């Protein structure tokens, strides 16, 4: 498992690409901000205007564009450049594994797109390290293949279709992040992802993410990074926003959160498995990071699982 795989696992992400928008004539589709949710729009055909919260002017989306909001920034999709035609409503229906959102009748579609949604642990580092808006092109063969699969599933009512579109969301997220990271130094990043971009820190970060339970002292970390203590402390803080020791502690807690929700291991066992020396120390560190005790975090999983399905504000 590489570092991107691990960060996605620690984020505890679930999702689906189960909404298809087929818009004609005039239409208006607002999307509100939701905590611990991400949204992606994949433009298959046509074009649209999109007004994003905090931006003075609407952007234009065209066929082949993919726009991703890791933290579901508030935005409006519209047929009009002003994005203020709120009287033009959207009709919603179900067709197999997909929810179909449509407008108008007859004529060519002015916009054909798929919407993906992602839900994740609200502390998910990978989703907070990305910028508010990620815009990439779907000209990569892997993304083209994924869109073709979505189009096929939406055009045919086949058994197991829902499982396929749910699984494709995981593939889509990896492809989005991978494509964005491949843009290089011009792509704004924060936290762990920004640290990974620095060759001097990459090996250290990758090793800690893969083995947080190891004993991590400053001597071991400086040796792995081939930096002096002062250099490591300064560079790590500069690139990630936290100290090396805080980073180790953070990854241990993220791994613990996964174990608390996915296993029945005791809190003590979880603490020891991720590198803490005592349940007391672990409990204090966990509550400082998550605001609740490890036991309460585990209990909250049942409430999260029973939460209402995701829906757009249309």
Predicted regions and their residues:
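DNA-recognition helix of C2H2 zinc fingers
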Residues: 283
């Amino acid at each position: 498992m590489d570092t991107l795989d691990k960060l996605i696992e620690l984020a505890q992400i679930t999702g689906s690409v189960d909404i298809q928008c087929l818009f004609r004539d005039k239409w208006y589709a607002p999307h509100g901000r939701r905590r611990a949710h991400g949204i992606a729009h994949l433009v298959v055909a046509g074009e649209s205007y999109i007004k994003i919260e905090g931006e003075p002017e609407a952007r234009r989306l065209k066929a082949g564009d993919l726009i991703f909001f890791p933290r579901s920034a508030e935005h409006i999709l519209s047929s009009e450049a002003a994005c203020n035609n709120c009287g033009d409503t959207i009709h919603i229906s179900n067709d197999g594994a997909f929810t179909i959102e449509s407008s108008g009748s007859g004529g060519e579609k002015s916009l054909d797109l798929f919407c993906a949604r992602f839900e994740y642990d609200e502390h998910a580092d990978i989703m907070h390290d990305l910028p508010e808006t990620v815009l990439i092109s779907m000209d990569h063969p892997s993304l083209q293949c994924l869109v073709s699969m979505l189009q096929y599933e939406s055009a045919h009512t086949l058994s197991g279709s829902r499982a396929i579109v749910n699984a494709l969301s995981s593939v889509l997220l990896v492809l989005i992040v991978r494509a964005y990271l491949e843009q290089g130094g011009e792509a704004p990043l924060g936290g762990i992802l920004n640290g990974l971009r620095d060759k001097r820190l990459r090996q250290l970060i990758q090793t800690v993410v893969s083995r947080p339970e190891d004993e991590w002292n400053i001597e071991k970390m400086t040796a792995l990074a081939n930096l002096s203590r002062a250099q490591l402390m300064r560079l790590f803080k500069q690139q990630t926003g936290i100290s090396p020791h805080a980073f180790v502690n953070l990854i241990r807690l993220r791994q613990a959160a996964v174990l608390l929700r996915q296993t029945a291991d005791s809190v003590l066992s979880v603490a020891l498995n991720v590198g803490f020396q005592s349940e007391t120390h672990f409990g204090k560190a966990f509550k400082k990071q998550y605001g609740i005790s490890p036991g309460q975090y585990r209990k909250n999983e049942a409430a999260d699982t029973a939460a209402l399905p995701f829906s757009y504000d249309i």
